[in-house]
Regions:
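Sec-dependent N-terminal signal peptides
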Residues: 3-14
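Generic detector of short, well-ordered, non-transmembrane alpha-helical segments enriched
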Residues: 14-15, 312
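Boundary of Sec targeting at the N-terminus
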Residues: 18-19
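Acidic/histidine-rich, surface-exposed loop or edge segments in extracytoplasmic proteins
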Residues: 23-40, 288-301
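Short, solvent-exposed recognition patches
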Residues: 31-279
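Feature detects long, helix-prone N-terminal segments enriched in hydrophobes
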Residues: 283-288, 302-306
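Surface-exposed amphipathic alpha-helical segments
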Residues: 294-327
Length: 327
């Protein structure tokens, strides 16, 4: 009789637990990996695609063997290929692997109190890309097209050496100032700690802006409005050569309306940079990764997002990624 009562109590306890879906219980629930919708494949040769898929599979294996999702489903997808018009003299193909941290959520609309579902969207993601830096106006392993409106790329922060890689900085990208503030943390893994881009000098930048302004004047006609900016450019070009060889640090929205350079660290400024084609081994097939970027994007204030992101970071091995370069 006592055994029957004990079994009944245990059954009731488990039944109660099964009916009680809470945020706290779901946070501890073992998660799962799931292949999500796969992205496009464009302008990639069959031979290169085979090699690129092998690289992505190695990245997935690295992360999935070192990290077990908890309280979420991790959806992952891939993209291979490029728009040929986005660069010129392509050296390597861009391709990438993306992870989406999808939380388990209690279904408050269901009469079944134990029911939960997988969220359909997330602000918390991980991207590991080969041969492209998306945060740098899409720097590719190629030159800038001749018809590019700008003629250079905009870098927000100086890269810094850290943990065997280049830390490209962090940036708030959503929910600014809120508990759920969304931040990106960007890393770059390269050959011999070199960079696939170089800094444009003030002189180079001034010449680019002068040409753009001259084109605008030809199309729209001269005016006092444009003439004052041309005067600013010509005045800067008369400075000492040592000043003109300094990196161009510019106000973000002050390109064709040139008023002057700013100092490093000025809010709302950028470094003008260009692809460094001498960085690359041009004898390698386009499928070879010649640099990787790793971007962690996480929404703060949610333990599932924060704990899973911390675990992912431990699984992403920068040394292993560096060892893949050129292979």
């Amino acid at each position: 009789m006592k055994q029957l009562i004990l079994v009944t109590v245990i059954f009731i306890s488990f039944s109660s637990l099964a009916q009680d879906c809470t945020k706290e219980l779901l946070q501890q629930k073992p998660g799962a990996w799931k292949a999500g919708p796969q992205g496009s494949i464009h302008d990639v040769s069959a031979a290169d695609l085979v090699k690129e898929k092998a690289v992505i599979n190695a990245i997935h294996k690295m992360v999935s063997t070192g990290y077990a999702p908890k309280g979420c489903q991790v959806s992952y997808s891939t993209v291979y290929g490029k728009n040929p018009a986005a660069g010129k003299n392509w050296i390597a193909d861009p391709y990438y692997y993306a992870m989406y941290i999808l939380r388990y959520l209690c279904d408050k609309n269901s009469t079944d109190k134990s029911k939960y579902y997988v969220d359909v969207s997330t602000p918390t993601t991980v991207n590991i890309t080969a041969n492209v830096i998306f945060s740098l106006n899409n720097l590719y392993a190629s030159g800038i097209p001749d018809d590019d409106l700008r003629g250079y790329l905009k870098l927000k922060q100086q890269p810094k050496k850290k943990d065997g890689a280049w830390f490209m900085g962090e940036e708030v990208v959503g929910d600014y100032g809120m508990v759920s503030e969304i931040k990106e943390y960007r890393w770059l893994i390269t050959y011999e700690d070199k960079l696939p881009f170089s800094f444009i000098t003030r002189k180079e930048y001034l010449i680019i802006q002068k040409r753009r302004l001259e084109q605008t004047i030809r199309e729209e006609g001269a005016s006092d409005f444009y003439n004052k900016f041309m005067s600013n450019i010509n005045g800067e070009l008369k400075r000492a050569e040592a000043d003109l060889m300094k990196p161009a640090i510019c106000p973000w929205n002050d390109e064709q309306r040139f008023t002057g350079f700013v100092e490093e660290g000025t809010p709302g400024s950028f470094y003008a940079v260009k692809p460094n084609l001498d960085y690359y081994n041009k004898q390698l097939p386009r499928s070879c990764p010649q640099f990787f970027t790793v971007v962690y994007k996480v929404s703060k204030g949610d333990p599932v997002f924060e704990e899973n992101m911390a675990a992912v970071k431990k699984a992403v091995d920068f040394a292993a990624l560096k060892n893949m370069l050129g292979k």
